């Protein structure tokens, strides 16, 4: 049992995170130099995301009997994303108004370092609904894969899958080649994931070494408030959705525990995307559903980011004594319903969307972003973890709604049961 524990990715990543925290705390300069380890691991994951999405979506769509099912799956997924992300925004808005973590800080926006957020503000100006929609269409297929733009690759994969399906038996050879290529890609993923402990160690050592645990104290109330809100959202909101769907949120979290630890170490939910595609299929969700819901969710179903955006915006208002009446907060909510859909599941994207939102609302000082610039990195873990769990739950829910969920398989896997009813440890 001890040997299997030490060999498990779960144990290795958890140990690596702990060592990274200790190194960053006691030897901050050395810890800060570990950044390339974390960056290298994330780059390796990003290298493989585009081909994984392409293969999964193409084989999933081309293998379906009816194309109407694909459209129905997409429509149901977008409806679910909109409802749940709106709930996340509202919950963040309610809790930050009740707790008021920024009240009493009395910060003068004129004294803040506006230059510190100038880069984010400049990037935020490029955000917009039209620009976002136009960006979904790649300039070239090669460009989409080269840049690793998830939505661009997804669009091409959907079109390719439709075209391959229309070829019928003539396209069988291409289908077989892509399916075989998919197996090779997942083999590469398994090799890359062996480096997850090193990546998690480097990323955590850098974070603690550069920013220090002490930097958490001054704005700790906002951080604690945000983490508690994310936990409540997962347990109460997603837990209720899971229960109605027919599974336990706690058993589901246990099932994806390794992916959660990888995300905890890297602060990017995107780092677990390839494994989530594989694990959700093993959980009983049809490949075509997994291939559509998971990648799309990384732009349209970021529950943790939604909570963060409302809480951070109102926190800045409270800290700078910028009064926000009910009209201003409703305006903020409406703007966030649109701008939050442009956030990708990568580290730092939430901060850029926040800058875009504050600029769009106009009532809040953009310089106020400097207040949370230093602690944004510490809140990204909770954002990424919540995003990952949210997209996993969404996949199961959508699969059930479109009748593409194997309920028996779902129950067997989450309860560590073999198909014959015997209980045993199912590898994750």
Curated annotation (Swiss-Prot):
State the InterPro entries in the record.
C4_dicarb_transport, Na-dicarboxylate_symporter, Na-dicarboxylate_symporter_CS, Na:dicarbo_symporter_sf
Q: Per the annotation, which location comes first and is thus the protein's main one?
A: membrane
Q: Which GO terms describe its cellular component?
A: plasma membrane
- GO MF annotations, alphabetized: fumarate transmembrane transporter activity; malate:proton symporter activity; succinate transmembrane transporter activity
Q: How does it sit in the membrane?
A: Multi-pass membrane protein
| Keywords of this entry | Cell inner membrane, Cell membrane, Membrane, Symport, Transmembrane, Transmembrane helix, Transport
Transmembrane found in the keyword field: yes
Carries keyword Transmembrane?
yes
One of its GO biological process terms is: L-aspartate transmembrane transport
Any one Pfam family here would be SDF
Residue ranges of the TM segments: 5-27, 47-64, 77-99, 141-163, 184-206, 216-238, 289-311, 326-348, 353-375
Location in or out of the cell: Cell inner membrane
| Family as reported in the entry's similarity comment | Belongs to the dicarboxylate/amino acid:cation symporter (DAACS) (TC 2.A.23) family.
| Biological role | Responsible for the transport of dicarboxylates such as succinate, fumarate, and malate from the periplasm across the inner membrane.
Q: Which NCBIfam families match?
A: PRK01663.1, PRK13027.1
The protein's matches in PANTHER family, at most eight in alphabetical order, are given as: AEROBIC C4-DICARBOXYLATE TRANSPORT PROTEIN (PTHR42865:SF1), PROTON/GLUTAMATE-ASPARTATE SYMPORTER (PTHR42865)
Protein name as annotated: Aerobic C4-dicarboxylate transport protein
Q: Look up and give the organism this protein is from.
A: Salmonella typhimurium (strain LT2 / SGSC1412 / ATCC 700720)
Lineage, opening ranks: Bacteria, Pseudomonadati, Pseudomonadota, Gammaproteobacteria, Enterobacterales
């Amino acid at each position: 049992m001890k040997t299997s524990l030490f060999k498990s990715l779960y144990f290795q990543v958890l140990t690596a995170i702990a060592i990274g925290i200790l190194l960053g705390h006691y030897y901050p300069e050395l810890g800060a130099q570990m950044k390339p380890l974390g960056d290298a691991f994330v780059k390796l994951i990003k290298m493989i995301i585009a081909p994984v999405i392409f293969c999964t979506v193409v084989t999933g769509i081309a293998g379906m009997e009816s194309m109407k099912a694909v459209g129905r799956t997409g429509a149901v997924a977008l409806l679910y994303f909109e409802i749940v992300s709106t709930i996340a925004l509202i919950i963040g808005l309610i809790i930050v108004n009740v707790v008021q973590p920024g009240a009493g800080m009395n910060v003068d926006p004129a004294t803040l370092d506006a230059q510190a957020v100038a880069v984010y503000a400049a990037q935020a100006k490029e955000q917009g609904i039209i620009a976002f929609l136009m960006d979904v269409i790649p300039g070239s297929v090669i460009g989409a894969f080269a840049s690793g733009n998830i939505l661009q690759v997804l669009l091409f994969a959907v079109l390719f899958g439709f075209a391959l399906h229309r070829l019928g038996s003539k396209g069988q050879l291409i289908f077989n080649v892509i399916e075989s290529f998919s197996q090779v890609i997942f083999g590469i993923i398994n090799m890359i994931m062996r480096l997850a402990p090193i990546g998690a160690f480097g990323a955590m050592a850098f974070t603690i070494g550069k920013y220090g645990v002490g930097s958490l104290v001054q704005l700790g109330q906002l951080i604690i408030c945000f983490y508690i809100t994310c936990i409540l959202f997962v347990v109460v909101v997603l837990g209720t959705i899971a229960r109605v769907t027919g599974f336990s949120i706690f058993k589901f979290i246990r099932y994806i525990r390794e992916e959660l630890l990888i995300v905890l170490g890297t602060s990017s939910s995107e780092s677990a995307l390839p494994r989530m595609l594989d694990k959700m299929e093993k959980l009983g969700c049809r490949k075509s559903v997994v291939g559509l819901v998971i990648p799309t969710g990384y732009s349209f179903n970021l529950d943790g980011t939604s909570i963060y955006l409302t809480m951070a915006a109102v926190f800045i208002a409270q800290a700078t004594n910028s009064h926000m009446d009910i009209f201003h907060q409703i305006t903020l909510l409406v703007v966030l319903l649109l701008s939050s859909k442009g956030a990708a599941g990568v580290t730092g994207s939430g901060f850029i969307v926040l800058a875009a939102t504050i600029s769009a609302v106009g009532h809040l000082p953009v310089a106020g972003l400097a207040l949370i610039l230093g602690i944004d990195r510490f809140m990204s873990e909770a954002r990424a973890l919540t995003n990952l769990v949210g997209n996993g739950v969404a996949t199961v829910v959508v699969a059930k709604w479109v009748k593409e969920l194997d309920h028996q398989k779902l129950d067997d896997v989450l309860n560590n049961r073999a198909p014959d009813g015997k209980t045993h440890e199912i590898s994750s």
